Amino acid sequence: MAPSHARPTQPVLSCRDVEKLYGTRDNVTRALDGVSFDVAAGEYVAIMGPSGSGKTTLLNCISTIDRPTSGHIYVDGQDITALRPGQLSKFRRERLGFVFQDSNLLDTLTARENIALALTINHAPAKEVVARVTGVAQRLGVTDVLDKFPHEMSGGQKQRVAAARAIVTD
């Protein structure tokens, strides 16, 4: 077999020497200590460890909820640790979606309205909102609950609606 000369693809996520310190000079907690890894497109990753090992801190840094003390985090080659506040807001708005363990759906909105929320906030045209919400609802199998409120849905339905809300802007 001939050797492959295909160019390796860039990781979708890359962490390089990420450190996070909390506390004061006299009482420092090192939550992350030189974390480095890559995630390729289509790859599934589990972050595992005992309580207090830094899993949530790492996810908070990757998701831009928190900033690392040092090191770099790249999303599709873009160093998100170097973004200024305005750039970071734009990055969050256009590139990130969150699905929390508790679905965090707004109780006063239907599933359809919850899914459409980011598009509505960003003033997307009404036809685009309808098309995107319908498309993502079909892909995630939640078309039957679009007009229901969160208290009328099962836990699994809420999670799928939350996932739809997270990816509707893609």
Where are these regions (language model features)?
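Pre-NBD coupling/linker segments of ABC/ABC-like ATPases
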Residues: 1-9
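ABC family nucleotide-binding domain
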Residues: 10-170
